[in-house]
Amino acid sequence: MSETAKKVIVGMSGGVDSSVSAWLLQQQGYQVEGLFMKNWEEDDGEEYCTAAADLADAQAVCDKLGIELHTVNFAAEYWDNVFELFLAEYKAGRTPNPDILCNKEIKFKAFLEFAAEDLGADYIATGHYVRRADVDGKSRLLRGLDSNKDQSYFLYTLSHEQIAQSLFPVGELEKPQVRKIAEDLGLVTAKKKDSTGICFIGERKFREFLGRYLPAQPGKIITVDGDEIGEHQGLMYHTLGQRKGLGIGGTKEGTEEPWYVVDKDVENNILVVAQGHEHPRLMSVGLIAQQLHWVDREPFTGTMRCTVKTRYRQTDIPCTVKALDDDRIKVIFDEPVAAVTPGQSAVFYNGEVCLGGGIIEQRLPLPV
């Protein structure tokens, strides 16, 4: 580290990963400060609202490490740039991924700008399980060392410029190591469970929460053969490949296998189901993606061989990618894939390197 230590602002969520990130950066000689972002205005007293507890934990960690904790409210930015689009996608019958949008608009845009302009930061840091590597003057996004926790899928919209201004200390570690460091340091977050639920909104009852903002429109549930076997409470509550929560568990036909959502007919408000998690109607040979983001920001032309994930924690799928125009690509899988879901993201890899990705516009069904 140079004589004048570089200043890093760590996004402190009140969790173990950001806590340990701050300590690791201190050990590396950086001048470290924390920032707690409030991105949702609580409108109830439900137990799912944990912002106050998270702030208290973040403050306790910063006090223990001897660093300053700043706070900022990005609720307006979150509503305008993340939540409204999230609702619009659900209304259109698609299944969006708010965490990806939140990283794009809040953590690596609003936070990055605030840290640089208002707090004089040289870098920001987060507790994401990813790594960066600088190659040929550009910063690359790499998978986290812990393949169980790798979060590169959620960060594919970042540009090489944003990655160059970001540090990911826990990306070089495995989760048990991170927890052990926190325990050894006596941090209050050491045994805190990992957060789940919608980015920044927390662990609310999703159906109830969504119902506040979008009116439910009940409709028919039909089989692939056209038989009506039930009623859904709203297409927005269902996604392709879903098994639980359909309310038709006792309905037996044919194979007696469980029912899965295989299609959503938005125009007619109909949910289509079939039996078996590998039913041909659930399988796709490829997809069309749009709203492309390539980490190196170079336009993609021609074709390439790589691997793709169509959802988080999925095993990499070998595929061929072909450019259709500036902002659309066609992806053909080597083998058919189940539950490819419009609105979700397709993220591409070359080995450890995350190349970028796009939003799934449509799936290319298996010919039957």
UniProtKB/Swiss-Prot annotation:
Enzyme class: transferase
Species annotation: Shigella flexneri
Single GO term (MF): ATP binding
Cross-referenced InterPro entries: MnmA-like (IPR004506), MnmA-like_C (IPR046885), MnmA-like_central (IPR046884), MnmA-like_central_sf (IPR023382), Rossmann-like_a/b/a_fold (IPR014729)
UniProt-annotated location(s): Cytoplasm
Annotated spans, Interaction with tRNA: 149-151, 311-312
Name of this protein: tRNA-specific 2-thiouridylase MnmA
Record site feature (Interaction with tRNA), residues: 128, 344
Catalyzed reactions per annotation: S-sulfanyl-L-cysteinyl-[protein] + uridine(34) in tRNA + AH2 + ATP = 2-thiouridine(34) in tRNA + L-cysteinyl-[protein] + A + AMP + diphosphate + H(+)
